[in-house]
Amino acid sequence: MRLKALFFLAWLITSLPTAAQLSRAQFSSLENILGEKSSFSGHMTGFILYDLDSQKVVYEKNSQLNFIPASTTKLFTLFAAVAILQDSTQTLRYVASGDTLKIWGAGDPSWKYQDFFQPDFEKVWKNYQVIQYSDANQVSPAFGYGWQWDDYYYDYSAERSPLPIYGNLLEVKKVGNRPEVFPSRFQKSISTTTLPIKELERDLHTNDFKYSPTTFLGRERFIPLLTSGQLTAELAQELTGKTWIYKKESLPENNQAFRGAPVFPLLQEMMLESDNFIAEQMLWMVSDHLFQTLDTERAIEYIQKTYFFDLPDQPKWVDGSGLSRHNLFTPRSMVVLIDKLYRIVPEDQLYALLPTGGKTGTLKNTFQAAQPYIFAKSGSMSNHYSLAGLVRTKSGKTYAFAFMNSNFLGRPSAIRAEVEKVMALVREVL
């Protein structure tokens, strides 16, 4: 990690003259496409372009204003994970007690989630038949601060938990004219309804499910489970064949840490596919590494005081994923973050982590060009769209940028199309 010599960027961002490196023609081109007669005039827009070589701002517009970042929040989470976790996940903490192994989850999201490399749990519990599981180290709740309660039903809003299994999701498929679910233990929790619902739906407060035989479409999908320590123990017992007991017990000081899977594939999924669940669990692993508790707020506070004290504007940062509308960042703080990532993450890894326009991840179908030129994280929710990362121009230079839009009417896709026009212009004229 090359974390030193990164803490004068705030002064550079706030004190250097705007557009110091642009010709009159270049400046006019950007002013015209972003000005009062442009598609951006009807809502709040912030934009900044930063020369990574000279460390100068070359253009900015409203870069001092706060915006809801949505999933560009994951850039902050990425930095935290790279700085603290380094190469592997925090998986478990454990102590032996006679013939029983007592364990506490450390936030690792990888157990039976997608096709990720699996931690070698047998190293920890192979000599024990009884495992006592506790979640007493969990401080933050399952739902993040400011998340919308009625998103509980959607897979992008899976609950956080200390030792997730299956990503805390229920897989749903259609067999005949009825739903079939995995884990199959929940099949008995499905009942029918006369309400004309089109998919399997979960009760808000329980893991009970309903569907309508007459209107069921049965698209393959995932539904978040209502998590609990008891459910974790029951699922783990089915998977391991060992006896699991759930008992809430404080984590003792003499515990040992077990670090499990490689962290890079998880970071890639978080960034390329904008996986909210992984992002949230990343901050819990950071918290476990630092404090041996699962506390999002405390982890964020530590990262901000240790690594982000020099940002031009202190962000209001409340979760790992960007699901919360309480997150507020300025574009000029975003480019300082991009610069930090650019300098501490090896170049090949950084470009593998950032979605590439026309090639990978959430930007696969946008910013298409013969030679990729956008490497960035996007973020969107109703009335908000942001993009932050790196742009490579035809002159061969690479710039950091942040482009944030808030309070617009209509679909984010319309704003995204206009953002693409601006970035294509940047590519051409700089």
Which stretches of residues belong to each language-model region?
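Bacterial Sec-dependent N-terminal signal peptides
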Residues: 1-26
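Conserved serine DD-peptidase/penicillin-binding transpeptidase domain
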Residues: 83-313, 429
